[in-house]
A protein has these predicted regions:
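Conserved beta-strand signature within the Rossmann-like core of class I S-adenosyl-L-methionine
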Residues: 199-214
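A short, conserved alpha-helix within the catalytic core of class I
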Residues: 184-196
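Core SAM-dependent methyltransferase catalytic element
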Residues: 272-275, 326-340
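Substrate-binding/catalytic lobe of Class I Rossmann-like enzymes that use SAM or dcSAM, i.e.
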Residues: 221-303, 307, 311-317
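N-terminal auxiliary segments of SAM/dcSAM-dependent transferases
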Residues: 2-52, 60
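Conserved class I S-adenosyl-L-methionine
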Residues: 96-105
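Conserved SAM-binding loop of SAM-dependent methyltransferases across substrates and taxa
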Residues: 106-121
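Class I SAM-dependent methyltransferase Rossmann-like catalytic core
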Residues: 46-91
């Protein structure tokens, strides 16, 4: 990427060493977007906070803890699938592929994919895209563990990072979207997101996506309301972030975590419940938020899918299904698709 394109896209380049660099949008753009989005999403009757704002440094750390909880099945089931792919995924790839991940690369799942790449590539070019600053920390640790790894991080939203990457080079990509984050989108958002993926993919690119499957309601609700209260802390942390970054005065003791599985819409719904009538100042959004007792702020939904829905979803955008892998209990799926 030349300096002119980088400047036009409003990104700044940081070079940490010969194998690690990252790009980040100018901070004023991010702050403006955060303040505007919070104002827009809370200044309405049906209040919500976009779940992408969960993942500051503390939020990302809390989510890593959630992933190790016994109730939270998605991570361990997806890992079990990835272990099966150690000899299978490489059949669809060659040594000209570079790796793009939507996420920080902090988990064992990233390492399982990198292990596959090391079997047929001496030099691995890896592009993690994450809105959280944890990206640089996780990248530094990966460099210590993988000698042939070269990392170019993009600290931005997934959509922003993908559009930036489209102009970066002409090499083939395997794009990863692991975990069950796709389920956080509404159907309209999900379709638009997949269209974005499709539009930035080159003809020979591949896309590997993790999707959570429909299962027993009790299993689902336990996964999002754990006995140790880590999910509660994770949910409340988004208010702490608004306090810190937008100069707000949320009192976290005035809110509780609430989640439920909506069978009709096949999704977990997660909320912050106001425990009293209260007012909150959000200075950088120039906004006074008034909440009634028991009023809900929607913070996340996590859709669950049947396999036929997954295929219809991906085919509807234009993807060609290459293969789907499941865990032993059919709790989770990984589907590999191509553009052509």
């Amino acid at each position: 990427m030349n300096d002119t394109i980088q400047k036009n896209l409003q990104y700044k380049k940081y070079v940490l060493d010969s194998r690690l660099q990252y790009f980040k949008p100018h901070s004023s753009i991010i702050e403006k977007t955060f303040a505007e989005e919070i104002f827009s999403s809370l200044n309405r009757d049906s209040k919500f906070i976009n779940p992408k704002f969960f993942y500051d440094k503390k939020g990302s750390d809390l989510f890593e803890k959630i992933c190790s909880l016994p109730e939270y099945y998605p991570t361990r089931t997806e890992i079990s699938i990835l272990k099966k792919l150690q000899t299978k995924l490489s059949l669809f790839l060659d040594d000209s592929f570079q790796l793009v991940e939507l996420g920080s690369g902090a988990s064992v799942k990233t390492r399982l994919i990198l292990d596959i790449f090391t079997k047929f590539k001496a030099k691995i070019e890896y592009f993690p895209i994450d809105i959280s600053e944890i990206l640089t920390e996780s990248s530094e640790q990966l460099l210590k563990d993988y000698d042939g790894l070269h990392i170019t991080g993009i600290i931005d939203t997934y959509e922003g990072g993908l559009k930036f990457l489209k102009n970066y080079n002409n090499k083939k990509n395997l794009i990863l979207f692991l975990g069950s984050s796709f389920g956080n989108f509404t159907p309209t958002e999900g379709h638009k997101f997949l269209q974005t993926i499709y539009s930035v993919m080159k003809p020979d690119d591949m896309f590997l996506i993790g999707l959570d499957l429909v299962k027993d309601k009790q299993i689902l609700e336990s996964a999002y309301n754990d006995s140790k209260g880590i999910t509660t802390k994770f949910n409340l942390n988004v208010l702490s972030r608004i306090n810190d970054e937008l100069d707000a005065d949320f009192n976290l003791n005035n809110f509780s975590h609430y989640s439920i599985y909506n069978t009709k819409h096949q999704r977990i719904e997660m909320y912050l419940k106001s425990l009293m009538n209260q007012s909150v100042v959000i200075s950088k959004s120039n906004f006074l938020l008034n909440l009634a007792k028991d009023e809900l702020i929607h913070t996340e939904h996590s859709h669950k899918y049947r396999l036929d829905q997954i295929y219809n979803l991906l085919n509807g955008v234009g993807f060609k299904i290459k293969h789907t892998w499941l865990d032993d209990h059919d709790y989770f799926s990984l589907t590999l698709v191509s553009k052509n």
